Amino acid sequence: TCEVLGEVTGDGRFVVHDEKDDTTPVDLDLAKVLGGIPQKTFTDERRKQKLYPLALPRCETKKEAVADALYRVLQNIAVGSKRFLVNKVDRSVTGLIAQQQCCGPLHLPVSDVAVVAQSHFGLTGAATAIGEQPIKMLIDPEAGARMAVAEALTNIMCARISALQDIKCSANWMWAPKLPGEGSAMYDAACAMRDLMVLLGIAVDGGKDSLS
């Protein structure tokens, strides 16, 4: 289930009504705020992808084949070490960090979840996890979006969360929608992610985009 905060009426006004005391603290004419800004229209068309089976180059020896395969796998940033990003920031600000990115005696950046305490003496806090599926997005944008949500949820399960409905997501879109077919692919991915989140009872309450 999802909370309904309001409805779009199309009358050009932003109205907040308080049912408790039957008052209307906000009744704003959007034309005075937006100043007649023309609505943008984006046009794109879906393009069927031409997908080919994975083909690895032939190597003369098994040693070369293993080395080549390892090199290709480690080029994927989701597989390689995040140390280049983790080591350059302070990971103990406020003194409330209960779980940071690095784990164990070797201080390896392999943690699935980050945990910040609410106080120095309490047993509650906030947990953060990430889900990213760029490779799957290239093959199937809708499936990739659902898998990104699933990855974030399986990562955050390492922390004892209060309830599934308490999870709020920040959706960050790194896409090139100006390329032919990419705008519609991003739209399909967003719809797939929305449908899954509605089904699970979680929601997006923020985010950013990089859509150059």
PLM region spans:
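Glycine/proline-enriched, intrinsically flexible loops and inter-domain linkers
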Residues: 1-212
